[in-house]
Amino acid sequence: MSTSEAGAAATVIPIDDVARDHGKAPAVATAPPPPAAAAAVPAAATTTAPRKTGVPFFRRADRGSRCVALLDFVLRVAAFGPALAAAIATGTSDETLSVFTQFFQFHARFDDFPALLFFMVANAIAAGYLVLSLPFSAVIVLRPQAIGLRHLLLVCDMIIAALLTAAAAAAAAIVDLAHSGNLRANWVPICMQFHGFCQRTSGAVVGSFLAVLVLLFLVILAAFAIRKR
């Protein structure tokens, strides 16, 4: 080995060995700081992100449709009461009139008149339909764009309105005959004797016609809503 090679070998000293000899820990390499542009991107994104706010139930886009659907729901509840009351009043309108003794009696029964029997059944069907249609009406309140349900309810409303109109008209004729009689046929009025029967059937006819009016308004309302959509 020459003198120059020995000098070169002597000058190579590891840094770790020197730091260990002096009692110092080796330097830890640190990552360079991120660029200013990269650090500013998340801050800008957080400042420009839109704030989440709750969407109101009656939005501006479909506020009118929701109001019409809500009115439809309320009217169905309103029509249910008169229809059910008419069916109950007719079904409980039987009356017995005793003359002289309890063995000689006259009866006034609603099922003796086919028109009144049809009237009671029609009102019971209408009341049941109005209850069953409430969930569908509630779905339309939540989803005004459900045109198929609107068409279905419109057709069913028209059928029930026609059925209830026929039943109420037939019952009204019988009630008028019970109040006034018919002189040409020698049919005497019976309401002078059977007060309870006539009062119940008369009230039932009035309630049924109220339900018919509400159903007709429902048909007009549904047609207007479908045409608007």
From Swiss-Prot:
GO terms for cellular component: plasma membrane. The keyword Flavoprotein does not apply. It comes from Sorghum bicolor. Residues 1-67, 137-157, 227-229 are cytoplasmic. The chain crosses the membrane at residues 68-88, 116-136, 158-178, 206-226. It comes from the Eukaryota. Belongs to the Casparian strip membrane proteins (CASP) family. This is Casparian strip membrane protein 1. It is found in: Cell membrane. Its main location: membrane. The keyword Protein transport does not apply. Keywords: Cell membrane, Cell wall biogenesis/degradation, Membrane, Transmembrane, Transmembrane helix. Homodimer and heterodimers. Residues 89-115, 179-205 are extracellular. Regulates membrane-cell wall junctions and localized cell wall deposition. Required for establishment of the Casparian strip membrane domain (CSD) and the subsequent formation of Casparian strips, a cell wall modification of the root endodermis that determines an apoplastic barrier between the intraorganismal apoplasm and the extraorganismal apoplasm and prevents lateral diffusion. It is a multi-pass membrane protein.
